[in-house]
UniProtKB/Swiss-Prot annotation:
InterPro entries: Ribo_uL30_ferredoxin-like_sf (IPR036919), Ribosomal_uL30_bac-type (IPR005996), Ribosomal_uL30_ferredoxin-like (IPR016082)
Family membership: Belongs to the universal ribosomal protein uL30 family.
Pfam families: Ribosomal_L30 (PF00327)
Protein name: Large ribosomal subunit protein uL30
MF-aspect GO terms: structural constituent of ribosome
Keywords noted in UniProt: Ribonucleoprotein, Ribosomal protein
UniProt source species: Mesorhizobium japonicum (strain LMG 29417 / CECT 9101 / MAFF 303099) (Mesorhizobium loti (strain MAFF 303099))
Source species taxonomy: Bacteria, Pseudomonadati, Pseudomonadota, Alphaproteobacteria, Hyphomicrobiales
GO biological process, one term: translation
Highest taxon listed in the record's lineage: Bacteria
Amino acid sequence: MAKKATKTITVEQIGSPIRRPKEQRATLVGLGLNKMHKQRTLEDTPSVRGMIAAVQHLVRVVDEG
């Protein structure tokens, strides 16, 4: 049986975590983002989508695929 291809989503940090609540900073770290304009490709799951929604003012979705 062939493996099912997992969907991915690429996010870029566009906002600084300075003077943001610690929960938002922790969410960015959880997404693997720690510097401005860094990009990470993550597995597209409901939990990742929720994390992106929590810091949507600090990140940008670059690619969904």
